[in-house]
Amino acid sequence: MAKTHEIKAERRADEGKGASRRLRHAGVIPAIVYGGELEPVSIQLNHEQIWLAQQNEWFYSSILDLNLNGDVQQVLLRDIQRHPFKQLIMHIDFQRVSANQKLSAAVPLHFINEEASPAGKSSEVVVTHELNEVQVVCLPKDLPEFIEVDLGALEVGNVIHLSEIKLPAGVEIPELKLGKERDVAVVAAKHVRIQEEDAAGEEGSEGAETK
């Protein structure tokens, strides 16, 4: 199980746009926590703490310990709304998780040993990461903070598919149960010449369609 991280919160008494605006001016983020067998609860968070937390990968993919006035609930971040141009978080949604109920979450992929691989050592090869995260299903205790993809043996022309990712125990990729066409490429190592030919072919197709 990935390490959990504590987020402090307080119950929010006032609701509505006016109340939310006042909270933001005071350096507080309006938020909500829902799910499980409990009713949704309007809460508020310290903007400075959350601003620092949201700069870390774990904030988006880990089980969080939401400390709500001393009552600790395990939650996942489900939505974060940001101001379009200010360094300001507008609202956050958390979902409670149950220890015995599987959850769905997006987990980041960490690519390792790429530079040491045959493909990575070649100046004539472009290694493309087609996916940077993957949707998984598992129990909360099994949720990984990230999944490593070892590229140490990557050769020129190789393609690593979703089904080839080594998953931690108890973790599944639901997309793979929906058919072979869902077994998409995660990493591709192409010779630069082939990469350029593919790009030229796509541009030609687009030009033909616009005529």
Swiss-Prot record:
One of its GO terms (cellular component) is cytosolic large ribosomal subunit. One of its GO terms (molecular function) is 5S rRNA binding. InterPro entries: Rbsml_bL25/Gln-tRNA_synth_N (IPR020056), Ribosomal_bL25/Gln-tRNA_synth (IPR011035), Ribosomal_bL25_b-dom (IPR020057), Ribosomal_bL25_C (IPR037121), Ribosomal_bL25_long (IPR001021), Ribosomal_bL25_short (IPR020055), Ribosomal_L25_dom (IPR029751), Ribosomal_uL5_bac-type (IPR020930). Residues 1-20 are annotated as: Disordered. Residues 1-18 have a biased composition (Basic and acidic residues). CDD domains: Ribosomal_L25_TL5_CTC (cd00495). This is one of the proteins that binds to the 5S RNA in the ribosome where it forms part of the central protuberance. Part of the 50S ribosomal subunit; part of the 5S rRNA/L5/L18/L25 subcomplex. Contacts the 5S rRNA. Binds to the 5S rRNA independently of L5 and L18. This is Large ribosomal subunit protein bL25.
